[in-house]
Amino acid sequence: MRHNSLSTLLTTGLAAATLMASGQVLAYGAGDFFTRVGVAKVEPKSDNGSLAGGAFTVDVQDKTDFAFTLGYRFHDKMGIELLAALPFEHDIALNGDNLASTKHLPPTLTLQYYPLGGTDARVQPYVGAGINYTFFSDEELAIGELELDDSWGAAAQVGIDLLIDENWALNAAAWYIDIDTDATINGAAAGTVEIDPLVVMAGLSYRF
């Protein structure tokens, strides 16, 4: 599922680039602030571990919602970007039954490299690496009380801007985020939930 989403993202981006009219567009460069806004799908990995000594297998469900980023280019080829979003609410299946849920906020800060930065190329790919902090809230469990600890983890990113004019671009991006949270059920330590999602986002980019 992850490979299909990433392949679709890149294929769509390249196809859109070939349809854009030829001509030069001023690319993003040093000193630019930008925002990216769109719809993001959070796809946790397929095996999220087990709880209560193996009594419950865990399956964290996918979720799609609004997301946005804020970024700054401190060099033609280098920048930083913060991924933010509305709280994502995930159903959690235990032994195949949806018995739990949680909300989380996953702000993710990445240092980015733009190989074509500072040029007038309409297609501007980039890669990034950084750190994530995930805040969990509103945990619910049908068979008791659930608590999930906040999480720190590494993050990696790949994306592409398809420039429309000096301010606007189409954008597609994907992040891999390391999210592991310790779970407590009815006050007792129950194990670790390994979410480790792929986040795929598509939308618009605007340069200020």
Regions found by a protein language model. Name each.
Residues 2-11:
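Bacterial N-terminal signal peptides that target proteins for export
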Residues 30-32, 39-41, 45, 69-141, ...:
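Gram-negative (and chloroplast) outer-membrane scaffold detector with strong preference
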Residues 36-66:
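N-terminal targeting signals for Sec/Tat export/insertion, comprising classic cleavable signal peptides
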Residues 47-54, 91-98, 137-146, 182-189:
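Outer-membrane beta-barrel translocator domains and adjoining extracellular loop/strand segments
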Residues 89-91, 101, 165-208:
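Predominantly the C-terminal beta-signal and adjacent terminal strand-loop region
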